[in-house]
């Protein structure tokens, strides 16, 4: 949506939300979307007419302060550019092995390997999980692919007249992989963190797993943050037993909390599937609200319950992704925010306190444990106000925690550095 709006707005820079949306020049499907969600149109317009130009000026003034954070992120982006992307429909690309002979020659393709029969679906699942971990995945779960959770069009490698209404038969199973972003960098969001470290690692793991499956004779397609998704990840992750859907709209896992970037590999290898889990996230999110209270854009619903918030047929807390993306483009350092990941009480490294809390809370019918934990986080740990994360003069481009030492430009770089401050 955002790219489509941007392309249309660049061709019609004098258009404003006071004009009919039909005059903007976006596809009819997007016209209908904006009519259903007019606030998204207002936010998209603000992002490209105001926020991005202002951010460019801010980077001229403050950019040196974030240069090492940008450099750190750029390394992952550079590697990600080498990862392969499907160039033909699933019925073609998923059934061939892509081989790159050398960097200066186009990749070659060869047929799938001879199909290897597994003794049982249980052993197939065990093998897949073992190799996925060794390919770099921290978490692995398996479920059946749900046609309701495929994107309605735009699958990679597919022409416009492709029939997107039918799920490819070989997308029977979905293997969901998850990895965390670097913990000390996560806490320095929204200004110093990057999504690309975990994007790169989970994408690499998924593409390796795709290659493994194809060698064994099974068609496969990796859906990754670096090379694109043809399906929606969070509900598949929930069904694969990795976690539960939180107030933020992403899957919160017992091991990593919200600090988990995910990829999916679809295939037809028969495997034993996992079951959804319940460790109390839904009830905890109802009373917590730390992510919503901290969100600089106000994109996360403050409602006590998602009752009545039905999006695409499923009930979950509303997220205004237009407001969210607008703040992405306001921040300094690598693009994005990730503040909701950083502040979430579940997003903590393993230690005895965190392990005890996540063990006791689901087993406490009184709610005393969760109430006590929330009181401690809200009263014993300092954090910037939501407004502080904005640009000066309203805020100071605050970070939830100070960046790790290796991202502090003032320590390493011989540059004139201006640190943002309120009113400055």
Where are these regions (language model features)?
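Non-catalytic, usually N-terminal nucleic-acid engagement modules in DNA/RNA processing proteins
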Residues: 1-183
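Phenylalanine-focused residue identity feature
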Residues: 5, 9, 33, 37, ...
């Amino acid at each position: 949506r955002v790219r489509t709006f941007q392309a249309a707005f660049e061709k019609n820079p004098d258009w404003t939300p006071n004009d009919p949306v039909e005059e903007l020049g976006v596809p009819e499907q997007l016209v209908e979307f904006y009519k259903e969600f007019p606030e998204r149109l207002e936010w998209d317009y603000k992002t490209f007419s105001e926020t991005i130009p202002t951010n460019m000026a801010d980077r001229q003034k403050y950019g040196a302060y974030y240069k090492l954070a940008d450099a750190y992120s750029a390394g992952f982006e550079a590697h990600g550019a080498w990862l392969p992307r499907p160039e033909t429909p699933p019925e073609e690309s998923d059934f061939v092995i892509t081989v790159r002979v050398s960097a200066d020659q186009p990749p070659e393709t060869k047929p799938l390997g001879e199909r290897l029969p597994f003794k049982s679906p249980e052993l197939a699942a065990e093998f897949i999980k073992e190799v996925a971990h060794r390919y770099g995945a921290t978490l692995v779960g398996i479920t059946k692919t749900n046609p309701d959770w495929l994107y309605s069009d735009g699958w990679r490698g597919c022409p416009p007249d492709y029939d997107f209404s039918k799920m490819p038969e070989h997308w029977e199973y979905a293997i969901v992989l998850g990895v965390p972003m670097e913990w000390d960098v996560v806490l320095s969001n929204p200004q110093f963190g990057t999504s690309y470290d975990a994007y790169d690692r989970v994408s690499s793991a998924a593409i390796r797993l795709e290659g493994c499956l194809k060698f064994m004779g099974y068609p496969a397609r990796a859906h990754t943050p670096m090379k694109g998704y043809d399906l929606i990840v969070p509900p598949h992750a929930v069904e694969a037993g990795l976690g539960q859907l939180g107030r933020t709209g992403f899957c919160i896992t017992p091991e990593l909390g919200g600090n988990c970037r995910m990829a999916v590999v679809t295939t037809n290898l028969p495997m034993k599937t996992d079951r959804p889990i319940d460790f109390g996230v839904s009830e905890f999110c109802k009373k917590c609200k730390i992510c919503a209270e901290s969100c600089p854009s106000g994109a996360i619903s403050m409602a006590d319950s998602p009752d009545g918030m039905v999006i695409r047929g499923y009930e979950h807390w509303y997220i205004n992704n237009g407001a969210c993306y607008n703040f992405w483009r306001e921040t300094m350092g690598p693009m994005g925010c990730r503040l909701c990941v950083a502040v979430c009480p579940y997003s903590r490294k393993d230690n005895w306190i965190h392990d005890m809390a996540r063990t006791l809370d689901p087993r406490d019918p009184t709610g005393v444990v969760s109430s006590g934990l929330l009181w401690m986080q809200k009263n014993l740990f300092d954090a910037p106000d939501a407004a502080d994360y904005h640009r000066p003069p309203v805020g100071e481009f605050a970070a939830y925690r100070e960046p790790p030492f290796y991202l502090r430009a003032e320590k390493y770089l011989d540059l004139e550095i201006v640190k943002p401050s309120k009113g400055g």
